[in-house]
Amino acid sequence: MSGIRVLVAGASIAGPALAHWLRRRGAEVTVVERAPELRPGGQAVDARGVAKEVIRRMGLDAAVRAACTDTAGAYTVDVDGNVLETYRADDNGGDGYISEIEILRGDLSRVLYDDTRDSVEYIFGDRIAELTQDADGVDVAFAGGDRRRFDLVVGADGLHSALRAMVFGPRERFVRHLGLVLAFYSVPNEFELDRWLIDYQESGRSAGLRPIPDATRAMAMFSFPAADLEVDYRDVAAQKRLLRERMAGMGWLTPRILTHLDDTPDFYLDQVAQVVMDRWSNGRVGLL
């Protein structure tokens, strides 16, 4: 692959991970990300089974482990905070309810970016506006006005992929909703979490708190059933209103956690969904 010019759309997890392997094989890689910088926040990512081997082969085992949440375990509670069930991180050889290697999405993104930033070109605050491909390459027009030519273009821009819509068609054709919405955001650690995750469930909904590497803060977690997201995934204010509506009347610490919703720096909400496609490439354009 020496000398092949590859454009990757998306600088979260999949994009920088792909860039790592492409660069190792000699490709010239550019990653474009519409956000002005790496996006913080998001859920915890558990590395299990083959994922541990992939991390090792990338030479990132030490970096990933250093950024782990160091969660000791989890327990479920009733409305009064009484413990119902306890799960330890070392259960089942470290692959139980809490994985031995557990890292926040934003921290994993930072590890992958730091690993590739010196050998990969990153363009933040821009996006692919138009592309035209022929037998020899792909001409790309960026929203910022730049025009460049690449040998391959790969979409790693997630559930709401703009590249997928541009090349394959509208998202409604491919996205299958699985009936659940998740939300995450950091809050001040005023709950004495120490190293334990707490989970409370009520009427098909859940609320929880988990420790994060910054011991002064904690991660709030919510889930609720929904046939669709119901709001624009880019409209954060509407997403926060939706979360408040769906969590209304829920017991335990839920009202207290929701008081921090407006001042959190890293709110994230999205539906749980699956992308189903007959093919993942079209000429010189592919998707992860």
Please provide the spans of the model-predicted regions.
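N-terminal Rossmann-fold NAD(P) dinucleotide-binding loop
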Residues: 15-16
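Residues at the starts of beta-strands that form the adenosine-phosphate
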Residues: 5, 28, 217
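Conserved N-terminal helical subregion
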Residues: 1-6, 23-25, 48-184, 227-244, ...
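Glycine-rich Rossmann-fold phosphate-binding loop(s) that bind the pyrophosphate
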Residues: 10-12, 34
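Flavin-dependent oxidoreductases
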Residues: 179-211
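FAD/FMN-dependent oxidoreductases across multiple families
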Residues: 213, 225-288
